């Protein structure tokens, strides 16, 4: 069990938000980046054969995260160290840190992990992050 489902959902949200940000705010072609809509597209044929991984992705498929000012922001994420939550409000989700916080009970949901890393960070424009469903209804997480 590498990642608990809630940690995996948080990682999925960070990856999705990061990719959407750079679709909306492209990096310069001279920098060698090639970010396209195919990078974060839902394709059932590519979903893991592991039922739990598929369920976790589906759980956040129609949810998006934005800054309190309404911007899709650069939600950085890195592996991080095992058995350490890392710094809160850093604007950078630690994959292993999120798994650690879920495992020890410091966070119960993917949304709590996302709030831990992104709320009041420079990345999210200094306020709490917000979550919305596909109908643009704000979710109270």
Locate each region found by the language model.
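Conserved, single-site charged/polar hotspot
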Residues: 1-141
